[in-house]
Structure formats: structure tokens, C-alpha cells
Curated annotation (Swiss-Prot):
It comes from Saccharolobus islandicus (strain L.S.2.15 / Lassen #1). Keywords: ATP-binding, DNA damage, DNA recombination, DNA-binding, Nucleotide-binding. PROSITE patterns: RECA_2, RECA_3. GO terms for biological process: DNA recombination; DNA repair. Involved in DNA repair and in homologous recombination. Binds and assemble on single-stranded DNA to form a nucleoprotein filament. Hydrolyzes ATP in a ssDNA-dependent manner and promotes DNA strand exchange between homologous DNA molecules. It comes from the Archaea. This is DNA repair and recombination protein RadA. The keyword DNA-binding applies. The gene is radA.
Amino acid sequence: MSNEVEQKKSIKTINDLPGISQTVINKLIEAGYSSLETLAVASPQDLSVAAGIPLSTAQKIIKEARDALDIRFKTALEVKKERMNVKKISTGSQALDGLLAGGIETRTMTEFFGEFGSGKTQLCHQLSVNVQLPPEKGGLSGKAVYIDTEGTFRWERIENMAKALGLDIDNVMNNIYYIRAINTDHQIAIVDDLQELVSKDPSIKLIVVDSVTSHFRAEYPGRENLAVRQQKLNKHLHQLTRLAEVYDIAVIITNQVMARPDMFYGDPTVAVGGHTLYHVPGIRIQLKKSRGNRRIARVVDAPHLPEGEVVFALTEEGIRDAEE
């Protein structure tokens, strides 16, 4: 038994997997499965198709990877200890951080949804800067990946925010991987390729998708396309969630809203994406415009956060607390 335990401990990379030929390992790497973590969370069917290997081989590889990483049933106490190790990124506003119990969490997908001008993209910019701060200042000393689907990323805004925090502007820019997604297939392919990037660069601690639904809405309009759209969107969101969980990364997605004509009381706006987006993100925050530069953030869904709302401000320097 001790020999078996020692063998598991000796498996550090996919090259150490027992009984797997170099040819198969090369196929796995080419298919984007370059780490034990990505193999452990893969499905046998997906791995078999992507790498061009028999289903039985895929099942064996996944089992070996899971055994090496000690993926098993855990006690509630173990889960509690893992939750205590979750890291957080400050938003720049103490009030908003308080609403989020300390900031944006790693290992979790957080959704910000709201109308145009409600502060979604501003928050994405600010978090891409703040993640680079040292932990004692609310960051993770990490890098960000920014997937822009609407062309709203502005380097000038990053520059202003970095300058306000006294950071070296060129260093901040250099620590943000930016890519413009031109359609849904490109957006999905980018996230597929992210597995390789984050496994090679463990300093990546934030992934932003702004916005996650824009291309899906444009390319799959009408009820006749709804099932296909939701299926693709669901798989896309789960890929992002896996990245968050496997690599201890914070994932931020933004989403638009639409009006519901059948609602005669309360807030008539709802987030785009239907039930798929109601259930996948771990934390859902609605943003609303208020007076001037003030914005309202409200917890819509989060298993560990109480319902509530706070006011914050969009300033020239970035996200800040609203002045009384």
C-alpha cells in the first residue's frame, strides 16, 4: 500500500503518468490537455475525441490523473478549510468589497449584469489593475486575461487607474493579456486555449469576459435557435468555471439586461442568457445607475452572501466609495 501511495506522490506532470506512451502524451498536449488538472476535470468522451485516442485509454488517463491529485470525497471540515484558502481581489470600493465579503473570489465565477453605463466594463478594468497589487493592498500579485467581445477595452482607462495607485504603467499593461473575440466560435476557442496559457503562467489570477453573451445573442437570434445557443453557452461557462476551480483563478463575466414586458411591478429588467446564466455563476451582482457617477450594486444570487445593496462611484481614478 505504501508503494502505491509513493507512486501517486511521484506523479507530478502528465509525463509521469504510468503506462501512457509518449505518442499519446504528445496528442494530449496538442489537444490542450497539458497538465494533470486539465485531465482530471475532463470527460472521457471529450478527451477521446479531442486527442484522438480510444475511450478506454481516455478513462484510464483521467483516473490516473485524479488519483495523483487525490480527487475524492471530502469531509465538510476539509471543504471548510479549502474555502478558508480562497483569495480575494479588492474592487477599489470598501463598500462594494463589504457586500462581497472581502472582494472578488478566486475559484469562483462572478457575474456583473446591468444596463449600458452601469459600470460593468469599468469594474473589469479596475480588477485587471487591482489583481496586480500585493495581497496587503487588496491584490494577488497576479496577472489578468481580458477577453473583449464588444471592443470596449480602453488602455487609457487602465493607465489612469494604474497611475492613481502609484503603479508602473508599463508593468501594469504588460501584465494584462488582451484579446478581442470576433464571434462565438472564436470566443469559445480562446477559452479552450486558455488552459495551456494558465498552466504555463501560474501568475494569472483573473480572467475577464466582457461581455459573455454579446456574440451568442447576435448569432443565435429567435426561439428557433435558443436550444443551440443555450447549449453552447452552457458548455462555455462550464469551461470557464473549471479554469477557476482548477487553477485558483477569479473569473469575471459581464452580461446585458433586457426588459420583460410581462412584468407590471418591481424591476422589469432581467439578465440575458436565461436559466443557463441563472445557475452557473457562483455569485451574481446586478449593477444600476444612480445619480451622477454613483452606481448601485445588489447581490442577486450567492449561496454564502446575504442579500443587500451598496452604492459606489465611478471616478476618474477608477472604482471608489461614493462620497456622502
